Amino acid sequence: MKKFLKVIWGIFAVIGILFTVRVLFLLNGNTTISIYPSTKGRFGEYVELLRNSGPFSKDTVSLEMKIVQDSVRAKEIRDYFQLDKLYDADADTWTKALAIGKFVATNIPHDNQEIEPEHRNAIDLWEYTKDVAPAFNCRLHSILTFELMLAAGLDARFVTCMPFDRYDNDCHVVNEVWLPELGKWAMIDSDMDGNYASDLDGTPLSLREIREHYISGEKMQYHPEFGKATTKLSMHYAYMAKNTYWFNCWETLSYYQEDGENRLREAGRDIYLVPSGFDGFGIREGGIVTTDADAFWAAPRK
């Protein structure tokens, strides 16, 4: 009997040790053990890839980055989400964009959904979180945020941010909003609790500027959960270093952009911005590859 009890206590001891180790990993923000270096651990490698990449340069590809408004659909979305309660009517563009980003990030957590939504538009995605699953991935976050910004009268888009490594299956999708007050784009991420980047003066940065800061080594601040700024090597800081090697965006954007009901997607072009000397990979049929960063980040046309 004593031997039996000894075995039982031994089993409980092992379980206790494993539980303690598991808790320690969770407290440190890790949910799995990996034989590969973490994203933060590879930050220097990602920055070197950016620094060794070819420059962006003008080419012969003609681009017309365009945003198409639909007043009827805009009103439907404003009324459904009661957007006028999120911000003051006379607020500036960035204040409105932040309010929308916070709204999405607060209400919808990140997850890689097991069931794909039947429709990819703001209202149906919101209904999906109530009826099917409460969370979804970065692309769906960005589509929802894009349509809310568009309904609020903001010029916005969603951009796929991609790594150098063709065997890295992880990319990230974020939004950019055009700030007419500053004459520039600004990145805003409504996924993973929300985030944006700024220079040390607090001016929000575009994806182009974020990439340039990594290359130059100039300090910038990330604002996790749209809150207090930090220059520390956070997960976001390292993650975006990996995923700002090249970019993808639709040339023309509007509501229902990646929904079966949309017609613009069928006629629109898929634009890929790559550094010189890099061919990209996984380019969709009909996609346009360019090295012209000025055209890619030009003011949107209407």
Predicted segments with their positions:
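N-terminal pre-domain segments of enzymes
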Residues: 34-44
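Low-complexity, Gly/Ser/Thr/Pro-rich intrinsically disordered linker/tail segments
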Residues: 216-302
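Hydrophobic/aromatic-rich core segments of domains that either
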Residues: 143-216
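Cysteine-centered nucleophilic/redox motifs
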Residues: 14-17, 100, 104, 131-160, ...
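A structural boundary/capping signal
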Residues: 26, 31-32, 147-150, 259, ...
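Secondary-structure boundary elements
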Residues: 42-136, 299-300
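Membrane-interface motif at the C-terminal end of an N-terminal transmembrane signal
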Residues: 16-36
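N-terminal Sec-pathway targeting helices
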Residues: 1-17, 23-24
